[in-house]
């Protein structure tokens, strides 16, 4: 029983000293922050918007141009290089599969693919007779399965 009493006394001493140290450390941090706020008010730092978070110092904005969008998986440039390689190696099935991966990343809807495959100027019978029409139908099926019209640029 004496061991537990000794442990309780040691715990009480450690807790009281840690609280005393943390309160002095907190007041020191507050003085540093107030000096920083005097030099750089939060409204000036964040473009006129007061900021109460201290985790992020730079305001993040989304770009509409797509330059800074994070690409996950394969990037378009890698897929196009693979497609060119598959074309040179005469692998038509691989070329089509890679093309079906590139078009959604480029956010092309079936109308754009229809025009890209040069089916836009043809009458319906001639378009259906064209071997590229099967690719258009296959991509339309993939596009609709992935979300269709909700996937286009906003």
From Swiss-Prot:
Tell me which Pfam families the record gives.
RXLR
Where in this protein does the record put region Disordered?
Answer: 42-70
Q: Any idea which UniProt keywords this protein has?
A: Secreted, Signal, Virulence
Residues spanned by motif RxLR-dEER? 53-72
Q: Does the record bear Transmembrane helix in its keywords?
A: no
**Keyword Signal, does the record have it?**
yes
Q: Which domain of life is it from?
A: Eukaryota
Q: Mind telling me which InterPro entries this protein's record contains?
A: RXLR (IPR031825)
- Identify this protein by name: Secreted RxLR effector protein PITG_15718
Inducing or repressing factors:
Expression is up-regulated during the infection stage of P.infestans with an increase to over 1900-fold when the sporangium and zoospore attach to plant tissue. High expression levels are then maintained throughout the infection phase.
- Name the protein family: Belongs to the RxLR effector family.
- Give the record's GO CC terms: extracellular region; host cell
Any notes on this protein's domains? The RxLR-dEER motif acts to carry the protein into the host cell cytoplasm through binding to cell surface phosphatidylinositol-3-phosphate.
Q: Where in the cell is it found?
A: Secreted; Host cell
Reported function = Secreted effector that is involved in host plant infection. Increases the susceptibility to P.infestans and reduces the plant growth. Affects the expression of host genes. PITG_15718-induced genes such as abscisic acid 8'-hydroxylase, a homolog of a salicylic acid-binding protein or a cysteine protease inhibitor gene, may negatively regulate the plant immunity or vegetative growth.
């Amino acid at each position: 029983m004496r061991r537990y009493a000794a442990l309780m006394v040691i715990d009480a001493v450690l807790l009281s000293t840690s609280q005393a140290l943390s309160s002095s450390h907190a007041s020191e941090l507050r003085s540093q922050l107030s000096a920083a706020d005097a030099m750089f008010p939060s409204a000036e730092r964040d473009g006129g918007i007061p900021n109460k978070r201290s985790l992020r110092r730079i305001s993040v904005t989304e770009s509409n141009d797509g330059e800074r969008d994070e690409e996950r998986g394969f990037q378009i440039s890698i897929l196009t290089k693979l497609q060119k390689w598959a074309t040179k190696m005469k692998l038509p099935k691989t070329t089509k599969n890679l093309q079906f991966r590139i078009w959604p990343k480029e956010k092309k809807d079936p109308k754009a693919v229809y025009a890209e495959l040069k089916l836009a100027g043809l009458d319906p019978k001639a378009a259906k007779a064209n071997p590229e029409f099967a690719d258009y139908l296959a991509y339309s099926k993939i596009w609709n399965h992935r979300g269709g019209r909700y996937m286009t640029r906003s």
